[in-house]
Protein backbone atom coordinates (compact mmCIF):
# COMPACT_ATOMS: atom_id res chain seq x y z
CA UNK A 1 0.00 0.00 0.00
CA UNK A 2 1.16 3.54 -0.73
CA UNK A 3 2.72 5.07 2.41
CA UNK A 4 0.77 8.30 1.92
CA UNK A 5 -2.54 6.44 2.09
CA UNK A 6 -1.37 4.43 5.11
CA UNK A 7 -0.56 7.71 6.83
CA UNK A 8 -3.98 9.16 6.01
CA UNK A 9 -5.70 5.99 7.16
CA UNK A 10 -3.88 6.00 10.49
CA UNK A 11 -4.74 9.64 11.09
CA UNK A 12 -8.38 8.89 10.35
CA UNK A 13 -8.31 6.04 12.87
CA UNK A 14 -7.11 8.50 15.48
CA UNK A 15 -10.16 10.65 14.95
CA UNK A 16 -9.03 13.16 12.30
CA UNK A 17 -11.62 13.57 9.63
CA UNK A 18 -10.66 12.36 6.15
CA UNK A 19 -12.15 15.40 4.42
CA UNK A 20 -9.87 17.79 6.26
CA UNK A 21 -6.81 15.70 5.46
CA UNK A 22 -7.68 15.47 1.79
CA UNK A 23 -8.35 19.21 1.67
CA UNK A 24 -4.98 19.91 3.23
CA UNK A 25 -3.31 17.46 0.84
CA UNK A 26 -4.90 19.12 -2.21
CA UNK A 27 -4.01 22.58 -0.92
CA UNK A 28 -0.41 21.48 -0.44
CA UNK A 29 -0.24 20.07 -3.94
CA UNK A 30 -1.67 23.32 -5.30
CA UNK A 31 1.03 25.28 -3.51
CA UNK A 32 3.70 23.00 -4.98
CA UNK A 33 2.31 23.56 -8.48
CA UNK A 34 2.18 27.31 -7.89
CA UNK A 35 5.85 27.27 -6.94
CA UNK A 36 6.70 25.38 -10.12
CA UNK A 37 4.79 27.77 -12.40
CA UNK A 38 6.74 30.69 -13.85
CA UNK A 39 5.99 34.07 -12.32
CA UNK A 40 5.76 37.08 -14.62
CA UNK A 41 7.47 39.31 -15.35
CA UNK A 42 10.57 37.15 -15.17
CA UNK A 43 13.03 38.08 -17.93
CA UNK A 44 14.56 41.36 -16.70
CA UNK A 45 12.63 41.87 -13.47
CA UNK A 46 10.43 39.97 -11.03
CA UNK A 47 7.13 41.22 -9.58
CA UNK A 48 8.97 42.26 -6.40
CA UNK A 49 11.26 44.60 -8.39
CA UNK A 50 8.45 47.00 -9.26
CA UNK A 51 9.04 49.11 -6.14
CA UNK A 52 12.73 49.63 -6.92
CA UNK A 53 11.98 50.59 -10.54
CA UNK A 54 9.35 53.07 -9.34
CA UNK A 55 11.83 54.52 -6.85
CA UNK A 56 14.42 54.90 -9.60
CA UNK A 57 11.90 56.71 -11.81
CA UNK A 58 10.87 58.98 -8.93
CA UNK A 59 14.32 59.83 -7.56
CA UNK A 60 16.71 59.81 -10.53
CA UNK A 61 16.22 62.53 -13.19
CA UNK A 62 17.54 60.32 -16.01
CA UNK A 63 15.13 57.54 -15.09
CA UNK A 64 12.21 59.93 -14.82
CA UNK A 65 12.95 61.31 -18.28
CA UNK A 66 13.48 57.84 -19.74
CA UNK A 67 10.15 56.61 -18.39
CA UNK A 68 8.34 59.76 -19.55
CA UNK A 69 9.76 59.22 -23.05
CA UNK A 70 8.51 55.62 -23.15
CA UNK A 71 5.08 56.64 -21.96
CA UNK A 72 4.76 59.59 -24.34
CA UNK A 73 5.60 57.43 -27.36
CA UNK A 74 2.71 55.07 -26.71
CA UNK A 75 0.10 57.06 -24.82
CA UNK A 76 -1.43 58.84 -27.82
CA UNK A 77 -2.05 55.45 -29.43
CA UNK A 78 -3.25 53.97 -26.14
CA UNK A 79 -5.77 56.79 -25.64
CA UNK A 80 -7.07 56.41 -29.20
CA UNK A 81 -7.38 52.66 -28.60
CA UNK A 82 -9.99 53.17 -25.88
CA UNK A 83 -12.51 54.45 -28.42
CA UNK A 84 -11.10 53.01 -31.66
CA UNK A 85 -9.50 49.64 -30.85
CA UNK A 86 -9.22 48.57 -34.49
CA UNK A 87 -7.08 51.54 -35.50
CA UNK A 88 -3.75 50.04 -34.39
CA UNK A 89 -4.47 46.34 -34.98
CA UNK A 90 -5.71 47.04 -38.51
CA UNK A 91 -2.29 48.47 -39.33
CA UNK A 92 -0.50 45.19 -38.65
CA UNK A 93 0.74 43.67 -41.91
CA UNK A 94 -1.46 40.57 -42.20
CA UNK A 95 -3.11 38.43 -44.83
CA UNK A 96 -6.45 40.08 -44.07
CA UNK A 97 -8.59 38.93 -47.00
CA UNK A 98 -10.78 35.91 -46.34
CA UNK A 99 -9.82 33.22 -48.82
CA UNK A 100 -6.22 34.50 -48.80
CA UNK A 101 -5.42 34.07 -45.12
CA UNK A 102 -2.45 31.93 -46.02
CA UNK A 103 -1.22 29.20 -43.72
CA UNK A 104 1.73 28.25 -45.94
CA UNK A 105 4.05 30.67 -47.73
CA UNK A 106 6.60 29.79 -50.39
CA UNK A 107 9.67 31.71 -51.40
CA UNK A 108 11.68 31.66 -54.59
CA UNK A 109 15.11 33.19 -55.17
CA UNK A 110 14.97 34.63 -51.64
CA UNK A 111 11.73 36.52 -52.30
CA UNK A 112 8.09 35.78 -51.47
CA UNK A 113 6.51 33.70 -54.23
CA UNK A 114 2.97 32.67 -53.26
CA UNK A 115 0.78 31.43 -50.42
CA UNK A 116 -1.67 28.58 -49.85
CA UNK A 117 -4.42 27.76 -47.37
CA UNK A 118 -7.03 29.86 -45.61
CA UNK A 119 -7.03 30.21 -41.82
CA UNK A 120 -10.13 31.05 -39.76
CA UNK A 121 -8.42 34.32 -38.74
CA UNK A 122 -6.06 36.72 -40.56
CA UNK A 123 -2.48 35.42 -40.56
CA UNK A 124 0.76 37.39 -40.26
CA UNK A 125 2.13 38.60 -43.59
CA UNK A 126 5.60 37.42 -44.55
CA UNK A 127 8.13 40.08 -45.69
CA UNK A 128 8.20 40.49 -49.45
CA UNK A 129 11.96 40.24 -49.95
CA UNK A 130 15.16 39.17 -48.23
CA UNK A 131 17.00 42.25 -49.53
CA UNK A 132 16.18 45.80 -48.58
CA UNK A 133 15.10 48.67 -50.83
CA UNK A 134 15.44 52.45 -50.71
CA UNK A 135 12.13 53.06 -48.94
CA UNK A 136 10.97 53.36 -45.35
CA UNK A 137 7.37 53.21 -44.21
CA UNK A 138 5.26 56.35 -44.00
CA UNK A 139 4.10 57.27 -40.45
CA UNK A 140 1.58 54.92 -38.85
CA UNK A 141 -1.17 57.49 -39.35
CA UNK A 142 -0.70 57.32 -43.14
CA UNK A 143 -0.60 53.53 -43.50
CA UNK A 144 -3.44 51.58 -45.06
CA UNK A 145 -5.68 49.83 -42.51
CA UNK A 146 -6.63 46.23 -43.30
CA UNK A 147 -4.14 46.28 -46.18
CA UNK A 148 -5.15 43.24 -48.29
CA UNK A 149 -2.46 43.59 -50.98
CA UNK A 150 0.71 44.08 -48.94
CA UNK A 151 1.68 47.08 -51.08
CA UNK A 152 3.27 49.62 -48.73
CA UNK A 153 3.42 53.40 -48.87
CA UNK A 154 7.08 54.36 -48.73
CA UNK A 155 9.36 57.37 -48.32
CA UNK A 156 12.55 57.49 -50.36
CA UNK A 157 15.45 57.30 -47.88
CA UNK A 158 17.72 59.04 -50.38
CA UNK A 159 15.32 61.96 -50.88
CA UNK A 160 12.74 62.11 -48.06
CA UNK A 161 11.16 65.28 -49.45
CA UNK A 162 9.77 63.37 -52.44
CA UNK A 163 6.08 62.42 -52.33
CA UNK A 164 5.45 58.97 -50.87
CA UNK A 165 4.98 56.14 -53.36
CA UNK A 166 3.17 52.83 -53.23
CA UNK A 167 5.75 50.02 -53.22
CA UNK A 168 4.50 46.63 -54.53
CA UNK A 169 4.48 43.80 -51.97
CA UNK A 170 7.10 41.75 -53.82
CA UNK A 171 9.42 44.80 -53.95
CA UNK A 172 8.81 45.97 -50.39
CA UNK A 173 12.19 45.02 -48.93
CA UNK A 174 12.02 45.05 -45.15
CA UNK A 175 8.95 47.32 -44.97
CA UNK A 176 6.52 44.55 -43.91
CA UNK A 177 8.72 43.37 -41.07
CA UNK A 178 9.53 46.95 -40.08
CA UNK A 179 5.82 47.75 -39.86
CA UNK A 180 5.07 44.80 -37.59
CA UNK A 181 8.17 45.32 -35.44
CA UNK A 182 7.11 48.94 -34.90
CA UNK A 183 3.62 47.97 -33.75
CA UNK A 184 4.80 45.09 -31.55
CA UNK A 185 7.38 47.43 -30.01
CA UNK A 186 4.53 49.78 -29.09
CA UNK A 187 2.82 46.81 -27.44
CA UNK A 188 6.04 45.91 -25.60
CA UNK A 189 6.48 49.45 -24.28
CA UNK A 190 2.82 49.74 -23.32
CA UNK A 191 3.04 46.46 -21.42
CA UNK A 192 6.02 47.83 -19.48
CA UNK A 193 4.15 51.05 -18.62
CA UNK A 194 1.23 48.90 -17.43
CA UNK A 195 3.53 46.87 -15.17
CA UNK A 196 5.02 50.02 -13.64
CA UNK A 197 1.81 52.06 -13.25
CA UNK A 198 -0.97 49.47 -13.10
CA UNK A 199 -3.03 51.50 -15.61
CA UNK A 200 -5.09 48.95 -17.51
CA UNK A 201 -5.51 51.07 -20.63
CA UNK A 202 -1.87 50.24 -21.46
CA UNK A 203 -2.46 46.54 -20.83
CA UNK A 204 -5.52 46.48 -23.07
CA UNK A 205 -3.57 48.13 -25.91
CA UNK A 206 -0.66 45.68 -25.57
CA UNK A 207 -2.98 42.69 -25.23
CA UNK A 208 -5.08 43.49 -28.30
CA UNK A 209 -1.96 43.78 -30.48
CA UNK A 210 -0.39 40.65 -28.99
CA UNK A 211 -3.56 38.60 -29.44
CA UNK A 212 -3.94 39.45 -33.14
CA UNK A 213 -0.27 38.60 -33.71
CA UNK A 214 -0.51 35.40 -31.65
CA UNK A 215 -3.50 33.80 -33.35
CA UNK A 216 -2.26 35.01 -36.74
CA UNK A 217 1.08 33.30 -36.16
CA UNK A 218 -0.47 30.17 -34.61
CA UNK A 219 -2.03 29.18 -37.94
CA UNK A 220 1.18 29.69 -39.95
CA UNK A 221 3.46 26.86 -40.97
CA UNK A 222 7.20 27.54 -41.38
CA UNK A 223 8.00 28.97 -44.82
CA UNK A 224 8.94 26.56 -47.63
CA UNK A 225 11.77 27.11 -50.10
CA UNK A 226 11.52 24.32 -52.73
CA UNK A 227 14.59 25.49 -54.68
CA UNK A 228 16.67 25.88 -51.49
CA UNK A 229 17.57 29.49 -52.27
CA UNK A 230 18.15 30.04 -48.54
CA UNK A 231 19.96 26.76 -47.97
CA UNK A 232 17.21 24.21 -47.29
CA UNK A 233 13.70 23.34 -48.44
CA UNK A 234 12.34 25.08 -45.36
CA UNK A 235 9.57 23.74 -43.19
CA UNK A 236 11.12 21.93 -40.23
CA UNK A 237 14.14 20.66 -42.17
CA UNK A 238 17.43 21.62 -40.49
CA UNK A 239 19.99 23.77 -42.27
CA UNK A 240 19.92 27.00 -44.23
CA UNK A 241 19.29 30.51 -42.96
CA UNK A 242 15.48 30.87 -42.94
CA UNK A 243 13.73 31.58 -39.67
CA UNK A 244 10.23 30.52 -38.75
CA UNK A 245 8.83 33.55 -40.49
CA UNK A 246 11.66 35.48 -42.13
CA UNK A 247 14.28 34.86 -44.80
CA UNK A 248 17.03 35.14 -42.19
CA UNK A 249 16.70 33.57 -38.76
CA UNK A 250 18.64 36.53 -37.34
CA UNK A 251 15.82 38.82 -38.57
CA UNK A 252 13.00 36.67 -37.12
CA UNK A 253 12.56 39.29 -34.43
CA UNK A 254 8.79 39.71 -34.07
CA UNK A 255 8.95 37.08 -31.33
CA UNK A 256 11.42 39.13 -29.27
CA UNK A 257 8.97 42.00 -28.88
CA UNK A 258 5.95 39.73 -28.49
CA UNK A 259 7.70 37.82 -25.69
CA UNK A 260 8.25 40.98 -23.67
CA UNK A 261 4.67 42.19 -24.16
CA UNK A 262 3.62 38.76 -22.88
CA UNK A 263 5.99 38.96 -19.90
CA UNK A 264 5.00 42.42 -18.67
CA UNK A 265 1.24 42.17 -19.34
CA UNK A 266 0.93 38.48 -18.46
CA UNK A 267 -1.78 38.75 -15.82
CA UNK A 268 -4.00 40.88 -18.07
CA UNK A 269 -3.32 38.74 -21.14
CA UNK A 270 -4.38 35.57 -19.37
CA UNK A 271 -7.65 37.18 -18.28
CA UNK A 272 -8.38 38.55 -21.77
CA UNK A 273 -7.74 35.87 -24.40
CA UNK A 274 -8.50 36.38 -28.08
CA UNK A 275 -12.13 35.50 -28.87
CA UNK A 276 -10.99 32.87 -31.36
CA UNK A 277 -8.99 31.02 -28.71
CA UNK A 278 -12.08 30.80 -26.53
CA UNK A 279 -14.04 29.52 -29.53
CA UNK A 280 -11.57 26.67 -30.15
CA UNK A 281 -11.17 25.85 -26.46
CA UNK A 282 -7.55 26.96 -26.04
CA UNK A 283 -5.95 29.35 -23.57
CA UNK A 284 -3.44 32.12 -24.20
CA UNK A 285 -0.61 30.57 -22.19
CA UNK A 286 -0.72 27.24 -24.03
CA UNK A 287 -0.87 28.80 -27.49
CA UNK A 288 1.81 31.38 -26.66
CA UNK A 289 4.17 28.64 -25.48
CA UNK A 290 3.58 26.66 -28.68
CA UNK A 291 4.23 29.69 -30.89
CA UNK A 292 7.32 30.77 -28.93
CA UNK A 293 8.72 27.24 -29.14
CA UNK A 294 8.26 27.19 -32.92
CA UNK A 295 10.52 30.22 -33.26
CA UNK A 296 13.03 28.63 -30.89
CA UNK A 297 12.98 25.17 -32.47
CA UNK A 298 13.43 26.55 -35.98
CA UNK A 299 16.13 28.91 -34.73
CA UNK A 300 18.07 26.04 -33.19
CA UNK A 301 18.60 24.39 -36.58
CA UNK A 302 18.95 27.49 -38.79
CA UNK A 303 21.15 30.54 -39.15
CA UNK A 304 24.88 30.25 -38.50
CA UNK A 305 26.87 27.96 -36.22
CA UNK A 306 29.53 30.54 -35.43
CA UNK A 307 30.37 34.22 -35.82
CA UNK A 308 27.91 37.09 -35.49
CA UNK A 309 25.16 35.01 -37.15
CA UNK A 310 25.31 32.57 -34.26
CA UNK A 311 25.26 35.27 -31.58
CA UNK A 312 22.47 37.20 -33.32
CA UNK A 313 20.52 33.97 -33.72
CA UNK A 314 20.66 33.28 -29.99
CA UNK A 315 19.65 36.89 -29.41
CA UNK A 316 16.39 36.23 -31.26
CA UNK A 317 15.72 33.08 -29.23
CA UNK A 318 16.67 34.15 -25.71
CA UNK A 319 13.61 36.16 -24.66
CA UNK A 320 11.05 33.56 -25.78
CA UNK A 321 13.15 30.91 -24.00
CA UNK A 322 13.08 32.85 -20.76
CA UNK A 323 9.29 33.39 -20.68
CA UNK A 324 8.65 29.65 -20.88
CA UNK A 325 7.73 27.55 -17.86
CA UNK A 326 10.03 24.88 -16.47
CA UNK A 327 10.65 21.62 -18.33
CA UNK A 328 8.04 19.59 -16.44
CA UNK A 329 5.26 21.90 -17.66
CA UNK A 330 5.51 20.54 -21.21
CA UNK A 331 4.74 17.10 -22.62
CA UNK A 332 8.02 17.07 -24.58
CA UNK A 333 10.00 18.06 -21.48
CA UNK A 334 11.40 21.12 -23.28
CA UNK A 335 11.01 24.24 -21.22
CA UNK A 336 13.25 27.05 -20.09
CA UNK A 337 16.01 24.84 -18.65
CA UNK A 338 16.22 22.58 -21.69
CA UNK A 339 16.75 25.45 -24.10
CA UNK A 340 19.06 27.46 -21.84
CA UNK A 341 21.37 24.45 -21.54
CA UNK A 342 21.91 24.59 -25.31
CA UNK A 343 22.92 28.24 -25.04
CA UNK A 344 25.04 27.99 -21.92
CA UNK A 345 26.66 24.56 -22.12
CA UNK A 346 25.99 22.33 -25.11
CA UNK A 347 26.98 23.29 -28.67
CA UNK A 348 25.10 21.62 -31.53
CA UNK A 349 25.88 21.12 -35.24
CA UNK A 350 23.93 24.34 -35.89
CA UNK A 351 24.85 26.70 -33.03
CA UNK A 352 27.83 27.13 -30.75
CA UNK A 353 27.07 27.55 -27.06
CA UNK A 354 28.65 30.33 -25.00
CA UNK A 355 31.87 28.41 -24.11
CA UNK A 356 32.63 27.90 -27.80
CA UNK A 357 31.51 31.43 -28.70
CA UNK A 358 34.08 32.82 -26.28
CA UNK A 359 36.85 30.80 -27.93
CA UNK A 360 36.41 33.08 -30.95
CA UNK A 361 37.91 36.02 -29.05
CA UNK A 362 41.64 36.67 -29.28
CA UNK A 363 43.10 35.89 -25.86
CA UNK A 364 45.71 38.66 -26.19
CA UNK A 365 43.72 41.54 -27.69
CA UNK A 366 40.21 40.55 -26.59
CA UNK A 367 39.01 41.22 -30.14
CA UNK A 368 36.41 39.38 -32.20
CA UNK A 369 37.78 38.50 -35.69
CA UNK A 370 35.26 40.59 -37.65
CA UNK A 371 35.19 44.31 -38.48
CA UNK A 372 34.44 46.84 -35.68
CA UNK A 373 30.66 46.98 -36.01
CA UNK A 374 30.36 43.20 -35.83
CA UNK A 375 33.09 42.84 -33.20
CA UNK A 376 31.49 45.12 -30.66
CA UNK A 377 27.92 44.37 -31.63
CA UNK A 378 28.69 40.77 -30.68
CA UNK A 379 30.12 41.50 -27.24
CA UNK A 380 27.24 43.91 -26.67
CA UNK A 381 24.77 41.10 -27.33
CA UNK A 382 26.60 38.76 -24.96
CA UNK A 383 26.58 41.37 -22.21
CA UNK A 384 22.91 42.13 -22.91
CA UNK A 385 22.25 38.50 -22.00
CA UNK A 386 24.10 38.77 -18.69
CA UNK A 387 21.29 40.39 -16.66
CA UNK A 388 18.39 38.14 -17.74
CA UNK A 389 20.57 35.03 -17.52
CA UNK A 390 21.74 35.99 -14.03
CA UNK A 391 18.10 36.36 -13.04
CA UNK A 392 17.63 32.81 -14.34
CA UNK A 393 20.50 31.66 -12.10
CA UNK A 394 23.30 31.69 -14.69
CA UNK A 395 26.34 33.99 -14.36
CA UNK A 396 28.13 34.16 -17.72
CA UNK A 397 30.59 36.86 -16.67
CA UNK A 398 32.13 35.49 -13.46
CA UNK A 399 33.98 32.55 -15.00
CA UNK A 400 34.72 34.20 -18.33
CA UNK A 401 37.33 36.96 -17.98
CA UNK A 402 37.67 37.04 -21.79
CA UNK A 403 34.16 38.53 -21.94
CA UNK A 404 35.25 41.44 -19.77
CA UNK A 405 38.46 41.81 -21.80
CA UNK A 406 36.41 41.86 -25.01
CA UNK A 407 34.26 44.72 -23.72
CA UNK A 408 37.35 46.74 -22.80
CA UNK A 409 38.94 46.06 -26.21
CA UNK A 410 36.79 48.85 -27.62
CA UNK A 411 39.05 51.52 -26.11
CA UNK A 412 41.99 51.26 -28.57
CA UNK A 413 39.49 51.45 -31.45
CA UNK A 414 37.88 54.70 -30.25
CA UNK A 415 39.04 58.20 -31.14
CA UNK A 416 39.01 61.03 -28.61
CA UNK A 417 35.44 61.94 -29.54
CA UNK A 418 34.33 58.38 -28.58
CA UNK A 419 33.74 57.45 -32.23
CA UNK A 420 34.66 54.01 -33.55
CA UNK A 421 37.39 53.58 -36.15
CA UNK A 422 36.13 52.51 -39.56
CA UNK A 423 37.40 49.69 -41.73
CA UNK A 424 35.89 46.72 -43.51
CA UNK A 425 32.13 47.04 -43.82
CA UNK A 426 31.66 49.01 -40.61
CA UNK A 427 29.84 52.32 -40.59
CA UNK A 428 31.50 54.02 -37.64
CA UNK A 429 29.62 56.22 -35.22
CA UNK A 430 29.77 56.35 -31.44
CA UNK A 431 30.70 53.38 -29.32
CA UNK A 432 27.77 51.52 -27.76
CA UNK A 433 27.83 52.68 -24.16
CA UNK A 434 25.25 50.10 -23.16
CA UNK A 435 28.15 47.66 -23.06
CA UNK A 436 29.61 49.61 -20.16
CA UNK A 437 26.21 50.01 -18.49
CA UNK A 438 25.79 46.24 -18.46
CA UNK A 439 29.22 45.80 -16.91
CA UNK A 440 28.60 48.58 -14.38
CA UNK A 441 25.47 46.76 -13.22
CA UNK A 442 27.39 43.51 -12.91
CA UNK A 443 30.47 44.99 -11.21
CA UNK A 444 28.30 46.93 -8.76
CA UNK A 445 26.34 43.80 -7.89
CA UNK A 446 29.55 41.80 -7.34
CA UNK A 447 31.37 44.63 -5.48
CA UNK A 448 34.17 44.81 -8.06
CA UNK A 449 35.52 48.31 -7.36
CA UNK A 450 38.24 48.19 -10.02
CA UNK A 451 35.73 47.16 -12.67
CA UNK A 452 33.29 49.86 -11.56
CA UNK A 453 35.96 52.55 -11.91
CA UNK A 454 36.98 51.49 -15.41
CA UNK A 455 33.49 51.34 -16.93
CA UNK A 456 32.23 54.37 -15.00
CA UNK A 457 35.12 56.35 -16.48
CA UNK A 458 34.04 55.36 -19.99
CA UNK A 459 30.40 56.25 -19.30
CA UNK A 460 31.27 59.61 -17.77
CA UNK A 461 33.43 60.43 -20.79
CA UNK A 462 30.59 59.58 -23.17
CA UNK A 463 28.20 61.77 -21.20
CA UNK A 464 30.63 64.71 -20.99
CA UNK A 465 31.20 64.58 -24.77
CA UNK A 466 27.44 64.36 -25.40
CA UNK A 467 27.87 61.01 -27.11
CA UNK A 468 25.75 59.23 -24.54
CA UNK A 469 22.70 60.01 -22.44
CA UNK A 470 20.95 57.79 -19.93
CA UNK A 471 17.72 59.62 -20.70
CA UNK A 472 17.37 57.32 -23.72
CA UNK A 473 17.78 54.16 -21.64
CA UNK A 474 14.50 52.49 -22.61
CA UNK A 475 12.76 49.99 -20.38
CA UNK A 476 15.74 47.61 -20.25
CA UNK A 477 17.85 50.39 -18.76
CA UNK A 478 15.16 51.26 -16.23
CA UNK A 479 15.08 47.62 -15.18
CA UNK A 480 18.82 46.93 -15.07
CA UNK A 481 20.97 50.09 -14.85
CA UNK A 482 22.41 51.27 -11.55
CA UNK A 483 20.68 54.33 -10.13
CA UNK A 484 23.78 56.49 -10.54
CA UNK A 485 27.16 56.40 -12.26
CA UNK A 486 29.93 57.06 -9.72
CA UNK A 487 32.41 59.87 -10.28
CA UNK A 488 35.86 58.35 -10.80
CA UNK A 489 39.22 59.40 -12.19
CA UNK A 490 39.63 59.24 -15.96
CA UNK A 491 41.29 56.10 -17.29
CA UNK A 492 44.47 56.50 -19.33
CA UNK A 493 44.26 55.19 -22.90
CA UNK A 494 46.70 52.87 -24.63
CA UNK A 495 49.36 54.68 -26.62
CA UNK A 496 49.39 51.95 -29.27
CA UNK A 497 47.58 48.75 -30.18
CA UNK A 498 48.00 46.08 -32.82
CA UNK A 499 45.73 43.28 -33.98
CA UNK A 500 47.59 40.78 -36.20
CA UNK A 501 44.33 39.19 -37.35
CA UNK A 502 42.79 42.46 -38.53
CA UNK A 503 46.18 43.80 -39.67
CA UNK A 504 45.29 47.00 -37.87
CA UNK A 505 47.49 49.39 -35.85
CA UNK A 506 46.42 52.39 -33.79
CA UNK A 507 48.80 55.00 -32.32
CA UNK A 508 47.65 57.83 -30.06
CA UNK A 509 48.95 60.92 -28.32
CA UNK A 510 46.16 62.31 -26.19
CA UNK A 511 48.34 64.14 -23.68
CA UNK A 512 48.28 67.48 -25.53
CA UNK A 513 45.49 69.66 -26.88
CA UNK A 514 45.52 68.13 -30.35
CA UNK A 515 44.48 64.60 -29.33
CA UNK A 516 46.27 63.05 -32.27
CA UNK A 517 45.69 59.52 -33.54
CA UNK A 518 46.91 57.45 -36.46
CA UNK A 519 45.60 54.16 -37.86
CA UNK A 520 47.12 51.77 -40.39
CA UNK A 521 45.00 49.02 -41.92
CA UNK A 522 46.27 46.12 -44.01
CA UNK A 523 43.02 44.26 -44.64
CA UNK A 524 42.26 40.64 -45.43
CA UNK A 525 39.52 38.61 -47.08
CA UNK A 526 36.55 37.44 -45.05
CA UNK A 527 35.19 38.37 -41.62
CA UNK A 528 33.54 41.51 -43.09
CA UNK A 529 37.03 42.89 -43.72
CA UNK A 530 38.41 44.22 -47.01
CA UNK A 531 41.76 43.21 -48.60
CA UNK A 532 42.44 46.68 -50.02
CA UNK A 533 46.18 47.14 -49.52
CA UNK A 534 47.41 49.62 -46.92
CA UNK A 535 45.04 52.32 -45.69
CA UNK A 536 46.23 55.19 -43.48
CA UNK A 537 44.08 57.57 -41.52
CA UNK A 538 44.98 60.55 -39.33
CA UNK A 539 42.93 62.12 -36.55
CA UNK A 540 43.34 65.34 -34.58
CA UNK A 541 41.12 67.32 -32.23
CA UNK A 542 39.12 64.11 -31.92
CA UNK A 543 38.12 63.93 -35.58
CA UNK A 544 39.29 62.23 -38.78
CA UNK A 545 41.18 64.73 -40.94
CA UNK A 546 39.33 63.58 -44.05
CA UNK A 547 36.21 61.49 -44.65
CA UNK A 548 36.54 57.73 -44.74
CA UNK A 549 34.72 55.64 -47.33
CA UNK A 550 33.04 53.59 -44.58
CA UNK A 551 30.88 50.63 -45.52
CA UNK A 552 29.16 49.92 -48.80
CA UNK A 553 25.42 50.30 -49.32
CA UNK A 554 24.62 46.60 -48.94
CA UNK A 555 25.97 43.10 -49.38
CA UNK A 556 24.49 43.07 -52.88
CA UNK A 557 25.92 46.36 -54.20
CA UNK A 558 29.05 46.46 -56.35
CA UNK A 559 32.41 47.51 -54.95
CA UNK A 560 33.76 50.90 -56.02
CA UNK A 561 37.49 51.58 -56.29
CA UNK A 562 38.71 54.94 -55.04
CA UNK A 563 41.98 56.80 -54.43
CA UNK A 564 42.85 60.05 -52.71
CA UNK A 565 45.87 62.32 -52.56
CA UNK A 566 48.84 61.30 -50.38
CA UNK A 567 47.62 63.50 -47.52
CA UNK A 568 44.05 62.30 -47.74
CA UNK A 569 42.27 59.90 -45.44
CA UNK A 570 42.43 56.19 -46.25
CA UNK A 571 45.09 56.63 -48.93
CA UNK A 572 45.38 53.31 -50.74
CA UNK A 573 48.91 52.16 -51.51
CA UNK A 574 50.01 49.24 -53.72
CA UNK A 575 50.88 46.10 -51.85
Positions of predicted regions on the chain:
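Positively charged n-region of N-terminal signal peptides that target proteins for export
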Residues: 2-3, 17-21
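Aromatic (phenylalanine/tyrosine) cluster motif
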Residues: 5-9, 25
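Bacterial N-terminal signal peptides
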Residues: 23-32
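Sec/Tat signal peptide C-region and signal peptidase I cleavage site
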Residues: 33-37
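Low-complexity, Ser/Thr/Pro/Gly-enriched N-terminal "stalk/linker" regions
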Residues: 38-168
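Extended polysaccharide-engagement surfaces of secreted carbohydrate-active enzymes
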Residues: 45, 50-55, 62-65, 369-575
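Internal amphipathic alpha-helical repeat/solenoid segments
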Residues: 151-176, 233-244
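Aromatic-lined, polymer-binding surfaces characteristic
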Residues: 176-408, 414, 427
Amino acid sequence: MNRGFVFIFRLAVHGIRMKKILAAFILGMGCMLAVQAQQHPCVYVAPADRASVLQKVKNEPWAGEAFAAIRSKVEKYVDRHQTDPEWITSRLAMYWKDGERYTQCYLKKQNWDYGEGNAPVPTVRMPGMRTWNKYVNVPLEDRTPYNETGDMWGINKLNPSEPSVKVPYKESGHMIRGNNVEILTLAENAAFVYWVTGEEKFARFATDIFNVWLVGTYYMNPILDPEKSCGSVGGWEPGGICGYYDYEQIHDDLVMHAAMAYDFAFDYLIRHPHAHLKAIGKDTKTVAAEVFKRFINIGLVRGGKSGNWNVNGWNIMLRPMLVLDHNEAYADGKGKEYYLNLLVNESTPYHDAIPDILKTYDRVTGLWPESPGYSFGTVQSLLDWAAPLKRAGIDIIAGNPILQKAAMAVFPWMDDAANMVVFGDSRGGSANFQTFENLLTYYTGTDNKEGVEKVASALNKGISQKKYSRNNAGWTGLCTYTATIPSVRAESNERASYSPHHRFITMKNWEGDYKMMFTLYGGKKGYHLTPNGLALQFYAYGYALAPDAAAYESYWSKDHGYHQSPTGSNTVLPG
